[in-house]
């Protein structure tokens, strides 16, 4: 007996126990797929015959259970991503072509033992966040067929939430790999742009497109991402990962301030967002309200600025001869770019960089952002009556993410007070924090505790839990000119340093103002037996390479040694050679360098 949701950890456990085989799983997939009442989920399902043949072939070539990372795992593919042997249409029948090769990501997943169960429906040419812009019909919410599934990766999200795929591939330009996750009680893994190859994908906005992963748990999604990722020289937008870390303690989480909160009248989603804030606070995070304005203005550039011309560039030749084959709303959006000029494109780029600079103020005080995935939802009828404006509501908190080069993980946040529809939140951080975000996203998902996909009662498997990654960041205690707001603080912030906490040393340290230093610097020494109140200091973290460079620049008579803090911990920090204190003014009684400097102002 298979679970309702075919999560990766559960299937692997069943395979390891010999309880089921890939062929058994495929038979259940065939049965569930046929019985599902929503017939708009797939554009081209893999035939029953081919599914059985794929399972049998896998078992013959790799008979040992779990001998491949995704051995016997069923997955669906959005129909703007190539699968050899199945047509690619981008939800436009006249655009159909038959690829001879898999997309790079699909090839990697198949090589790892995963089995494609079909090509899924989408908003045509991945233009939309709602799922209604397709000639094949609109996939629906698995919780209420009156409601949209979310898009553009509509069918992909349903396959996982309904229980006939373990994971599914989507794409994400403006939120298409995150909004459907929120509406289907799923996880949406939105990698750093360039982490997954886009070769074999029909572009929407090629410079910011990402292949994404829908999964039941964060652990499942990360496991799939690790198989799929990797530099691809054939893709000019592919990037080699330069992994970044997040603080393991003292994490600062940015949340919407009052002025930028907009839920379009949906108080239920707002309550779930507030609950998520309290949940992440319970995990030890410091909550930091921030001004969303520059992020919102960057988001507006995707559809209201020159980036819409990138959608025209993707299909320019085809729309010139086949305009009548387009969904009317999609056609209107793409043809609206025809008047855009190169001057507008450059001005748009300049504006984006201005806004990026403005967002640096937020990233200086927050390590991660926690935002609603979508501030509201609508019925299919409501969406069709007002397709552009209501669609834009879904993207209010998603459209900026790729433009500003961020990683994101969308997770379920629970259900409304009537236990009817789900909502989600998204954790967002700068590029290549993908791995660092995962443990936090997993912990937050587990606190929501509302199952997986359509199975609200399901328990997230312990086997899929994402462990906290050990930090390689190096802590350092600063005493004087490197404190926040002091002249040399930029030597910490420039190479990616993060303030962890303000605290005090143990009581046996003394502080002196060193004569002739520019900018003025203190010297701190430890004197066993001295009974003071401790000195005000800050603990920062630096990447290892930056720490080494930082220490190498420290001028005599200063150096680095272990400093004992008032909590008994010992951390590397600034100390002074005793010879330099001859004739120096003692300023210990001020309690710290900042207070001493203020006393001289």
State where each predicted segment sits.
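Glycine-aromatic micro-motifs
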Residues: 442-447, 452-601
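Serine-dependent amide/ester hydrolase catalytic core
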Residues: 10-16, 31, 121, 247-248, ...
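Short helix-loop capping/hinge segments that flank enzyme active sites or metal/cofactor-binding pockets
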Residues: 69-92, 250-256, 306-360, 365, ...
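A short helix-breaking turn/cap at a secondary-structure junction
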Residues: 190-275, 294, 439-468
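Gly/Ser-rich catalytic/binding loops embedded in alpha/beta enzyme cores
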Residues: 2-174, 278-284, 361, 492-493
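Acyltransferase
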Residues: 19-27, 56, 265-291, 315-321, ...
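Short glycine/serine-rich loop segments
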Residues: 102-228, 402-415, 421-426
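Residue-level signal for inorganic ion chemistry
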Residues: 29, 221, 253, 280, ...
